């Protein structure tokens, strides 16, 4: 600092101010120091740039993540909204075709249908109903859009002389497949049916249910749905014998889409099990019942005020709001005030496994309760055939013993024996016929009817798949009442020469059948002779 001051003081007086200012400036740094400084500055600047780029990328990433979160939340909300919408549709009872409780048809026509085997005849004044074959053909002739059929048997195309009606039915189904009519068929996986294979090749949709895997049982359901309007429910499957030597009974509903709305869900339940070896833990809401024994369908049947619902078995196949078959039968017996008439092929209150047989009290106990506690008259009409279990007679004797010392206890049992007629036939007649069997499965009371697919055997209800129908009517005196018609059918059979009060003998008495008419295709008629009073 002193040197610079000396230089400034010793400067010539002729030097300008600018020259003195330049002399006073510090010396320039060396080139090497300049390069180091430049590199350092460039490095700092590059780091600043990298930091700014990273910050911008981070902002973009955070922004993208926020957008993804928002989009995911919107998708979730949309999914929940769709689920709620479909849930609301299910609650309203609407199916995929737009059919709901609000727009379905509940003013219906109903008809009993029967198959009466050739050679089984009644008196001329007996009631008769629409032949089963004619009823089925009517349904197929009415079909314009769809035919849904559940059946345990599919044996229509047989060469036996009495199988002609089955062959005609098979030909009609084949014809429908070429008319742009949707055909959906359900059968048990054990069914080895050429009929099903032929229909499948023509475009029919076939579903096989593996009941053995589900519940160690088999499919016994038998019902039709045509055009989402018409329904058949009854004992007969698609077997040529059901149109020949088997005595069958069922009902057909016409223009009854409200009943279809509920029954279609059982069909959909069966279809949902296609390719599955186990039953789902929870059923879709679209398979929930629409009506049950607490919320019955209100409808008109032949202009008669009625209530109805369908039930299902086994309990494993009963989603929410679907009545179990046993509960449906209970509701009919509990509502009876005067009488309960039951017609089944087999009555055996036993549950059987491969190792043991145990008493199954569900229905047997309910009958005893009605007899003893409510003094309701009970009539049991049971088929007698080669497969009748000897224990049946023990249980019947046990039931009869209840009424021996109890006032107002009325129980009567008869066995409907059609094999006796075959035993009395000539050798030539036997070669032309198969053993006949009464396969009716129904119950009728003074206010209700139950038509099902099961005999009253424990394993049927606990293991097998079957469907039942309950109809309630207040006025059962009108001839249009399906309850009255079914009661008349029961009494026709009860008072016929085929029904015997005592245990049938395996040695047939052919003299009682000598006056029977020769086999004919005429409808059944009624035998009014030899009636016992109902109050007995």
Predicted features by range, described:
Residues 2-536:
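Charged, low-complexity intrinsically disordered terminal segments
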């Amino acid at each position: 600092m002193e040197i610079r001051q000396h230089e400034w003081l010793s400067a010539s007086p002729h030097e300008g101010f600018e020259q003195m200012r330049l002399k006073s400036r510090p010396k320039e740094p060396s080139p090497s120091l300049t390069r180091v400084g430049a590199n350092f500055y460039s490095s700092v600047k590059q780091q600043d740039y990298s930091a700014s780029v990273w910050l911008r990328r981070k902002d973009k990433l955070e922004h993208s993540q926020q957008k993804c979160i928002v989009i995911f939340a919107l998708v979730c909300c949309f999914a929940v909204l769709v689920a709620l919408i479909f849930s609301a549709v299910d609650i309203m009872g609407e199916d995929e075709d737009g059919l709901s409780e609000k727009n379905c048809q509940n003013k219906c026509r109903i008809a009993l249908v029967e198959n009466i085997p050739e050679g089984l005849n009644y008196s001329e004044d007996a009631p008769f109903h629409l032949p089963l074959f004619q009823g089925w053909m009517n349904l197929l002739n009415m079909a314009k859009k769809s035919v849904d059929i559940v059946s345990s048997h599919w044996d229509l195309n047989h060469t036996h002389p009495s199988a002609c009606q089955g062959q005609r039915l098979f030909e009609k189904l084949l014809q429908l497949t070429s008319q742009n009519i949707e055909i959906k068929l359900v059968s048990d996986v054990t069914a080895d049916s050429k009929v099903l294979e032929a229909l499948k090749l023509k475009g029919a949709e076939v579903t096989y249910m593996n009941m053995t895997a589900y519940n160690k049982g088999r499919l016994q359901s038998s019902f039709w749905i045509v055009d989402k309007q018409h329904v058949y429910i009854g004992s007969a499957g698609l077997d040529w014998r059901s149109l020949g030597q088997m005595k069958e009974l069922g009902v057909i509903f016409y223009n009854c889409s409200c009943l279809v709305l509920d029954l279609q869900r059982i069909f959909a339940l069966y279809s949902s099990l296609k390719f599955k070896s186990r039953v789902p833990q929870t059923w879709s809401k679209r398979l929930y019942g629409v009506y049950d024994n607490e919320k019955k369908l209100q409808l008109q049947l032949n202009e008669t005020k009625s209530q109805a619902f369908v039930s299902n078995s086994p309990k494993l196949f009963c989603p929410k709001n679907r009545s179990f078959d046993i509960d449906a039968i209970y509701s009919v017996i509990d509502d009876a005030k005067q009488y309960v008439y039951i017609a089944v092929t087999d009555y055996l209150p036993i549950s059987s496994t491969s190792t043991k047989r145990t008493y199954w009290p569900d229905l047997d106990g309910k009958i005893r309760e009605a007899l003893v506690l409510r003094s309701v008259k009970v009539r049991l009409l049971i088929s007698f055939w080669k497969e009748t279990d000897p224990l049946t007679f023990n249980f019947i004797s046990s039931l009869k013993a209840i009424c021996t010392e109890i006032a107002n206890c009325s129980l009567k049992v008869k066995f409907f024996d059609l094999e006796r007629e075959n035993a009395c036939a000539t050798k030539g007649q036997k070669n032309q016929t198969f053993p006949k069997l009464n396969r009716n499965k129904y119950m009728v009371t003074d206010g209700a009817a139950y038509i099902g697919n099961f005999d009253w055997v424990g394993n049927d209800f606990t293991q097998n798949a079957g469907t039942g129908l309950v109809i309630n009517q207040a006025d059962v005196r009108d001839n249009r009442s399906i309850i009255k018609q079914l009661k008349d059918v029961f009494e026709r059979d009860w008072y016929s020469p085929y029904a015997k009060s005592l245990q049938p003998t395996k040695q047939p008495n052919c003299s009682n059948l000598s006056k029977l008419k020769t086999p004919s295709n005429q409808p059944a008629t009624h035998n009014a002779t030899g009636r016992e009073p109902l109050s007995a």
